[in-house]
């Protein structure tokens, strides 16, 4: 008889820059973001409009922050401030400071400021739905087709650590997040929420049910993986960008290696954007 032994392969570094110069990214006209590369060499991207909202889970060292940088940089390379605005909630106040002077970005590190931002986005969501209703438009895309000279921009909210926000901001945080997650997609407001603590107390049932796209990096336990992805497997990943990616509408995840981007590369991209704004 034969004995089969599964040997983990060494992970080859995937660079974000290579994904951003790829023709698939360059030729896409949506709000396209680079996710990672599969073992067969295929590159995976997703449009925030199709993703709706994204939940990213991963313990320290899993590559969670790099994934957030990849998504942010993809959007900044793709769209201008008239087309989108990125709100980055950064409780650590260090990870996303690079972007604070860009016209397309607002970085918030104070919890009170973050709660206020989420509340204001709920108000903005209601305002947009009033406009859509009064103009007979079904969603932001039909509105922007009809009023191409004065389009509605997409607002994308990145939350670096949900547990910090939930513990310090109280129930109002969950209430605002759930309202946005349930209703805001059609009017062009999206959430990208990251946590290193995928437990039911942090990623509540209502939040999870309304985050249809999931990225699970290495997590500590099977239970964490079940919260992050609705299935086991995240606990067996290798860290450093090794991920299971479950796009909106898909039943089974694909294993990818997320793109790497250095601090120098981030600074160079931001400097180039600053020059042109």
Predicted regions and their residues:
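Conserved helix/coil segment N-terminal to the catalytic DExD/H
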Residues: 144-149
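P-loop NTPase catalytic phosphate-binding loop
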Residues: 2-6, 14, 19-138, 151-237, ...
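Active-site nucleophile elbow and catalytic-triad environment of alpha/beta-hydrolase enzymes
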Residues: 141
């Amino acid at each position: 008889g034969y004995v089969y032994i599964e040997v983990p392969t060494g992970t080859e570094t995937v660079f974000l820059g290579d994904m951003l110069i790829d023709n698939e990214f360059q030729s896409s006209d949506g709000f396209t973001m680079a996710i990672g590369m599969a073992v067969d060499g295929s590159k995976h991207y997703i449009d925030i409009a199709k993703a709706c909202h994204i939940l990213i889970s991963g313990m320290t060292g899993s590559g969670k922050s790099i994934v957030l940088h990849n998504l942010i940089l993809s959007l900044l390379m793709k769209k201008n401030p008239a087309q989108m605005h990125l709100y980055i909630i950064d409780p650590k106040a260090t990870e996303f400071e690079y972007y604070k002077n860009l016209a397309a970005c607002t970085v918030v590190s104070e919890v009170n400021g973050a709660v206020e931002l989420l509340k204001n986005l709920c108000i903005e969501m209601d305002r947009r739905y009033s406009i859509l209703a009064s103009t007979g438009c079904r969603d932001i895309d039909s509105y922007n087709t009809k009023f191409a000279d004065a389009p509605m921009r997409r607002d994308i909210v990145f939350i670096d650590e949900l547990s910090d926000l939930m513990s310090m901001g109280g129930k109002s945080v969950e209430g605002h997040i759930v309202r946005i997650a349930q209703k805001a997609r059609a009017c062009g407001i999206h959430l990208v929420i990251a946590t290193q603590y995928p437990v039911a107390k942090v990623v509540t049932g209502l939040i999870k049910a309304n985050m249809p796209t999931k990225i699970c990096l290495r997590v500590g336990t099977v239970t964490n993986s079940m919260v992050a992805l609705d299935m086991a497997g995240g606990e067996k990943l290798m860290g450093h960008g090794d991920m299971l990616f479950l796009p909106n509408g898909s039943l089974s995840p694909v294993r990818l290696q997320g793109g790497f981007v250095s601090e120098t590369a981030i600074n160079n991209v931001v400097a180039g954007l600053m020059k042109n704004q």
